[in-house]
């Protein structure tokens, strides 16, 4: 299947392995749409958050994710002649909601479990990571570190694999994610993430402003974090039925009997580690439409916080196309 697009002069399965195009063609031959995410975490550390966000979002629904990259030695030199590909089938994530630097829960992933045909199922790729300053630029050591503008070395994320050379570990430099999805799922993780980050940044500005006015205590008391996951309608309703925080039976019944599309994006908002709000987006809509089909506020005494966001001058103009903001305005009446 992967080689079906090749001309007669080309080998169907070359000795050098499959190219990215071959893999994408194989996914399409199964009547699925491949979502391609290119990442270069050595040149931009923020791209790791995008990569981990995609893994967290799609893997929860059982979507197998193909990860390609290059194996490197500890000194940054390449190992082997070509790239390497693995299938991600799990991860481990820090359950630490007090980390104010993480706006997305997915950024707490610190280990991937992958199927590596040369190691076996559930081989691990662990992250060795320390804080990176916002003004850091890439150092030529290919992912081993970054250097701040003042020249002081800072340790950067390295992906340590179970591969080794003469007892020394090899490191993985990710290049591409290929995510096979049903073609009716038109809204991507990136579509949702952009709107979520827009709301999160607006909240950050509002909270700082209120703290300056003395209307709010220290910022550490208001840590906002977001979870973005693809769900089926059945899985979503099952989670609603078993959710102890939705304690009013009429609220549960309304959601269990609601007509919903088959595929949904479930967006949860946590404040200080406690779930605060839920937004559900139609994943089968167009990316530019992105309809919010359900929303729920868990604690009524927190609604004032959301109203601050709505009432802050300029937010309505800036987020005129943000469907989450529009849903908040609708709920506020």
Feature annotation, model-predicted:
Residues 16, 44, 48, 149, ...:
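Intrinsic-disorder-associated interaction segments
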Residues 2-145, 237-332:
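Conserved active-site-adjacent core of cysteine acyl-enzyme catalytic domains
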Residues 208-211, 218-241, 249-252:
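C-terminal accessory extensions appended to soluble enzyme cores
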Residues 113-217:
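Conserved catalytic-core surface of thiol
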